[in-house]
């Protein structure tokens, strides 16, 4: 038969579980505006019942708080990273295509290749063919040829500038990738230190996910989390994980 304090202990465990749930709810509300924060929930399970050898069988022993976990679906993270990679790629392409479009523009406000070439091949050349001995016509044709030459010279300079800008941005992106990779590696170590004790490093995992969001906007990524097992007992998981990030399908 359980002691007289058994019911009090059951109630006490219920209060502890409710307090954990209340604190978790407060934390969720406080972080509503926090970038990358994942809502957390308390995982509870019924305590092992006590055998009392009575007709009603076992006496319930209350509730145990198992863990506080993130409410997050890795499937949607993977889908988001794929879409984010595409968006980053197309944004860069759009930017440089707009640069090229500006240089090749011929819309009436900006004199472009079509206008200059038409002046040279249609207006100037046809005039020379009709009046080959006219010095004014020849001079005008030479002027159109000079404009076309200057256009190509200017276009070469503009395209070289675009290429230089693209190379510079590529270097900056490589530096950014290396920086993000270093931060992710550092967080992995911190997460393992905490989770080896059986706790959940929810906030650190959120920070790592934010970094992965940023990384996926630059390059295609795939992630894999592999449990680390005890070297002396391969069937026993230590609680730590080896977190792998593959970049560009590597």
Identify the role of each PLM range.
Residues 145-192:
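Long, non-coiled-coil amphipathic alpha-helical linker/lever segments
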Residues 19, 184, 188, 208-209:
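Interfacial residues of coiled-coil/leucine-zipper alpha-helices
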Residues 1-123, 127-141, 146, 153-154, ...:
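Bacterial Type III/flagellar export signals at protein N-termini
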Residues 14, 112, 176, 200, ...:
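Conserved acidic
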Residues 194-201, 205-212, 217-218, 227:
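Aromatic-residue-lined binding/catalytic grooves and analogous aromatic/hydrophobic interfacial grooves
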Residues 118, 142, 178, 202-210:
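An alpha-helix initiation/capping motif
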């Amino acid at each position: 038969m359980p002691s007289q304090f058994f019911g009090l202990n059951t109630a006490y465990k219920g209060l502890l579980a409710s307090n954990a749930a209340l604190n978790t709810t407060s934390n969720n509300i406080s972080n509503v505006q926090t970038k990358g924060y994942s809502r957390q929930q308390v995982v509870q399970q019924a305590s092992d019942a006590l055998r009392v050898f009575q007709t009603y069988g076992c006496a319930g022993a209350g509730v145990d708080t198992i863990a506080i976990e993130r409410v997050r679906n890795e499937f949607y993270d993977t889908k988001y990273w794929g879409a984010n990679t595409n968006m980053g790629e197309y944004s860069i392409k759009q930017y440089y295509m707009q640069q090229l479009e500006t240089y090749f523009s011929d819309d009436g406000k900006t004199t472009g290749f079509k206008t200059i070439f038409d002046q040279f091949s249609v207006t100037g050349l046809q005039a020379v063919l009709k009046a080959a001995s006219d010095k004014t016509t020849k001079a005008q044709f030479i002027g159109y040829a000079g404009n076309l030459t200057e256009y190509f010279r200017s276009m070469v300079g503009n395209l070289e500038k675009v290429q230089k800008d693209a190379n510079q941005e590529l270097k900056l992106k490589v530096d950014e990738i290396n920086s993000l990779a270093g931060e992710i590696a550092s967080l992995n170590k911190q997460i393992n230190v905490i989770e080896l004790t059986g706790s959940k490093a929810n906030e650190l995992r959120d920070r790592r996910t934010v970094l992965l969001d940023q990384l996926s906007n630059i390059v295609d990524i795939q992630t894999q989390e592999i449990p680390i097992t005890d070297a002396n007992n391969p069937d026993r998981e230590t609680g730590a994980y080896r977190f792998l990030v593959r970049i560009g399908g590597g």
